[in-house]
């Protein structure tokens, strides 16, 4: 902008809504008033924006919906049941499909190359899953990228977008996959004004098809590139940075760099050897209790682990000591009560979308897609069950009793009134109408238990959140809310004002920082994980540990157990090989009891 580039010609892309929000705030602080504002977006939000505008060119309705993980899982369950594979894990099939889509592989190509029974099963499930998406006029996350990649093969649209955004910048470039690379390359075009920020040492998503090669080969892909090495670290103490350097330098497949701390040396890294996972959890909880008794704030403390199952025993210890905490990964928009309301919104907006290939257009009129209808038709109960819905979807409504047909007609009328509200009044008012007319509000108020009261508070919070879209022309605000819900990541759940200890996987911690960090479960087979197969990069586990270590600003605690309960049996444990990568002069064995209090002081 200082060189005269108009703000609206600049496109900045990152991976999470939280990161995009922080980027917007920083750009806003740097931008003089009246100079305009660049587009700052996540990859998936950018793709939604492009598909809303040009999607018809690739057969996408401008009113398409986006399926989240729960929507995808339920659809895959139906698919597998339909082909006699109901005992199979739908998430494994979805992961296999996502892996291929992320690599840019199309169904036709995959089907042609399928060599064994498993691959042929995946190909069949993929085909039927695609049909489910099409019937619902929906896209999953991978489709958002693939459809934009397909769209950019259109010379007219590609040229238009290249002229719209003449300067492209991408953060966390090491996390891009093959399709995202192609999108970036196509948007850059002849002007070649592209700036990327990336760190190979933090590439921890190759299992999601992130490609190290995108960053390693950047200078070959874009000749004339100028490389700026960012090696000064302003976050962590000198001791933490020295440990991080010692850990990551063991990896071979990286661009060499040596971080330099700008801060003081600081405290040593504290090691603790526990008897078992319970002893480890109590050490963590009691250490946090001492930190809180000192000058530390709960929101500046994080407990990290390799796998989600490790959180249970940690939660029990924190609860026992009355320490407030939150588990990152339980997303607001994935809570059942919130998804119920969103399903009403989506069903009302898409009330003319087909939900049964065998049903006539007259019989389908007034209903949304089967995912949402099956979720809301009995929430709250209205005398229409899943058996009735199955007959309706099969085009057998005429076979139903007249009383049941009357209930279906009333339900259609209800959706129509909701659709009218969403298309005419501000979104928050439309949501209040949906809560009242659907009976959801009455259902929650009639249930007196504490859990239901909390559910209703979550629904009310959804209404509060929707106010931000009230200024949008209906029904655009509703579509934007649905997009926000579908594209949310774990990190977007984090409220910086909430004063609680954070529990999360190391993957979820990427991009975050805390004054005090506990990295738990540092044992062979757990961290590094034993879940390594022939396609897994063994260096990625070390990169993951490097990410964990560099989340800490002031204090870092590294814990491991001599034995751990795994799959119902007590197993002896061996300390993680990563611990031996740290110079022992940087570490100190953590004290317990009264001695520990003097250490914290």
Predicted regions and their residues:
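P-loop NTPase Walker
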Residues: 1-62, 66-67, 136, 159, ...
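Short glycine-/polar-rich loops that comprise or flank the Walker A/P-loop
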Residues: 5-9, 35-37, 71, 190-193, ...
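Conserved RecA-like helicase motor-core motifs
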Residues: 34-39, 256, 322-334
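Conserved helicase C-terminal RecA-like lobe
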Residues: 115, 297, 311-323, 335-336, ...
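Short alpha-helix plus adjacent loop in nuclease-associated cores
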Residues: 46-54, 201-206, 235-236, 326-350, ...
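Conserved helicase NTPase motor core
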Residues: 4, 11-15, 19-20, 39, ...
């Amino acid at each position: 902008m200082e060189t005269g580039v108009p703000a609206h010609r600049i496109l900045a892309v990152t991976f999470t809504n939280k990161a995009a929000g922080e980027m917007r705030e920083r750009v806003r602080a740097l931008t003089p008033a009246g100079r305009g504002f660049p587009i700052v977006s996540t990859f998936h939000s950018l793709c939604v924006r492009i598909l809303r505008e040009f999607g018809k060119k690739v057969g996408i309705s401008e009113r398409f919906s986006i399926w989240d993980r729960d929507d995808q899982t339920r659809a895959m369950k139906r698919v597998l049941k339909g082909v006699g594979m109901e005992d199979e894990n739908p998430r494994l099939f979805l992961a296999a499909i996502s892996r291929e889509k992320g690599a840019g592989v199309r169904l036709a190509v995959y089907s042609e190359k399928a060599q064994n029974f498993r691959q042929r099963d995946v190909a069949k499930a993929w085909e039927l899953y695609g049909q489910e998406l099409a019937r619902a006029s929906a896209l999953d996350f991978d489709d958002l990228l693939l459809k934009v990649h397909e769209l950019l093969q259109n010379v007219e649209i590609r040229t238009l977008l290249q002229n719209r955004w003449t300067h492209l910048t991408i953060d966390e470039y090491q996390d891009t996959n093959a399709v995202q690379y192609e999108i970036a390359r196509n948007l850059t075009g002849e002007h070649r004004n592209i700036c990327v920020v990336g760190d190979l040492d933090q590439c921890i998503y190759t299992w999601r098809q992130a490609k190290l090669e995108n960053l390693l080969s950047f200078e070959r892909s874009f000749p004339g590139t100028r490389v700026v090495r960012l090696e000064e670290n302003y976050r962590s103490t000198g001791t933490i940075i020295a440990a991080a350097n010692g850990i990551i330098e063991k990896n071979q497949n990286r661009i060499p760099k040596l971080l330099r701390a700008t801060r003081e040396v600081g405290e040593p890294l504290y090691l603790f050897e526990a008897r078992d996972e319970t002893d480890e959890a109590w050490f963590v909880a009691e250490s946090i209790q001492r930190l809180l008794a000192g000058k530390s704030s709960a929101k500046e403390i994080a407990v990290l682990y390799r796998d989600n199952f490790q959180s249970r025993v940690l939660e029990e210890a924190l609860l026992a000591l009355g320490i407030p905490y939150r588990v990152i990964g339980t997303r607001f928009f994935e809570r059942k009560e919130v998804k119920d309301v969103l399903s009403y919104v989506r069903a009302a907006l898409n009330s003319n979308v087909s939900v049964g290939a065998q049903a006539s257009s007259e019989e389908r009129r007034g209903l949304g897609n089967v995912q949402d209808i099956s979720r809301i038709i009995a929430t709250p109960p209205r005398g229409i069950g899943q058996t009735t819905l199955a007959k309706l979807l099969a085009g057998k409504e005429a076979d139903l009793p007249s009383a049941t047909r009357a209930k279906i007609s009333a339900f259609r009328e209800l959706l129509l009134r909701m659709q009218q509200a969403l298309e005419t009044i501000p979104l928050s008012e439309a949501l209040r109408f949906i809560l009242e007319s659907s009976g959801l509000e009455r259902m929650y108020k009639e249930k007196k238990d504490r859990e239901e009261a909390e559910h209703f508070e979550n629904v009310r919070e959804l209404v509060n959140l929707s106010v931000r879209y009230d200024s949008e022309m209906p029904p655009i605000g509703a579509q934007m809310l649905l997009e926000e819900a579908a594209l949310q990541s774990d990190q977007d759940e984090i409220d910086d004002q909430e004063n609680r200890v954070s529990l999360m996987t190391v993957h979820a911690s990427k991009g975050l920082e805390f004054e005090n960090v506990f990295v738990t479960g540092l044992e062979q087979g757990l961290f590094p994980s034993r879940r390594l197969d022939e396609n897994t990069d063994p260096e990625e586990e070390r990169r993951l540990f490097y990410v964990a270590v560099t989340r800490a600003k002031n204090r870092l605690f590294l814990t491991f157990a001599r034995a751990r309960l795994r799959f119902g049996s007590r197993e002896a444990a061996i300390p993680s090989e990563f611990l031996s990568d740290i110079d022992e002069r940087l570490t100190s064995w953590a004290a317990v009891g009264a001695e520990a209090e003097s250490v914290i002081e």
